[in-house]
Amino acid sequence: MALSLVLSIVMAAMNAGCSAGSQRAVPEPLAFGVLGATCEPQRLAALRGAGVSIVELPVAWDRFEPRQGRVDSQYVADVVAQLEQCRQAGIKVILSPGLHYPPAWVRELPGGELRGSKGGVSRGSGAELIFSSEVRKAAHRYLSRLVLRLGVDQGMENIAAIRVGTNSSGELGYPGPDDGGNEREFWAFGDAPQKGTGLAEGVALSPMPGWVPGSAVWNGRAVTGRQVHEWWDWYAGSAVEAVVWQVKALRSLGYQGRVHVPVAGRGVLPADKAKAVAGHLDGRANPDGAQERGLDYLAQFAVLSMVPGVDVDFTGLDDVSAAAARSTVPRQDRCSPGDEEKAVKEDVSSWSSQRYTSALARRAGLGLVGENPGPPDFPFTGGSSLSDSLAEQLRTAPGYAVDCGMTMFLFGFEENLFDDGEGGVTLDDYKEVIQQSH
């Protein structure tokens, strides 16, 4: 069944007041964790004493398999040791397999890099899991080795979730609009999506091969709004299909636990999408580059709702949009009862990203977890001069998580809790926040 048809069926059901494959868990007390864990025993003891019960452990594909077919046994042993240390400390683990850290040889595979609409190649992008058959084969082999080794040495019982995504930050979506050195670049212009050469099994070819967003003509004829809409559905749908592929790959390898899909921002708002389609995706109604990133959460969450065991991980609790929405009258930063319907029926342009995206996840029946962006001056955190400081994020973000119905809050990052307060926060600060939540 074509992905666009799946979207139509699920969206029709949701708009009728139900959610397909609803899997939202009964609300439970908020669990607290950290991102970027080392699983170092002394730190684990301190974290557990503060009330932390879960950590995110990053693994790097390029370190696991630096050469094609050659596994770094010492690195694997180190990861296994980290997991064992967490298990002994009574701390659950969210595993990040690190597909967004592909080895150089993966990028050299046929179709190994995403190609932009202006000829660019994304700098530092993750593995090209969206369209490339060869990259997906390599990724599946890597995941099978990772899961097999962890299953043999550790078992998977202490792994609370595995994170999956498609971009260089490990989140859902394509690279940013400027990641290839050009302005406003879309990312589906390699031979696989345009010609079918090396296209992954089950992935659709572009519905308008050769058409570039912004152009009013294709094959000598005027482009219709319907054609642009179909192209957008294909573009955004291909990104979420790559996430579904990863979940299915993990299931086929025997992992049956929760899967977290990190998402940032609020994606393209429905009203903005209508304007963008009318303008042939020429850049209008695109305030934050969500179009080029292919983020259409209303439709994409509908697809994820059909996959059992999936939680949305919102990565920007108390991001810059929350700081702005907090200052409006009335304030629009906090999640509120009834947001699930308001999100699709009212003007939500003044809402914070966390409020809008959480409402869509709840509407789709998906589980919800969240994390703060991290230090505003760190790369990939979306920080600006208007962002809250790390200390302000620690004070504010957990409350947002509760308001939005999340079951878990992950603080970014572990290192910032053990840097003697250089980042403005300490583990004692986090402990106080956790104690106040109970």
Each predicted region: which residue ranges?
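The substrate-binding groove and active-site-proximal loops of carbohydrate-active enzymes
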Residues: 29-36, 61-76, 122-141, 225-241, ...
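Hydrophobic faces of well-ordered beta-strands that scaffold small-molecule active sites
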Residues: 30-34, 55-57, 93-97, 160-164, ...
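Catalytic domains of carbohydrate-active enzymes, especially glycoside hydrolases
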Residues: 37-62, 81, 92-94, 301-313, ...
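Aromatic-lined substrate-binding rim segments of carbohydrate-active enzymes
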Residues: 42-50, 56-121, 147-151, 251-253
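Substrate-binding cleft of secreted/luminal carbohydrate-active enzymes
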Residues: 98, 102, 297-327, 331-438
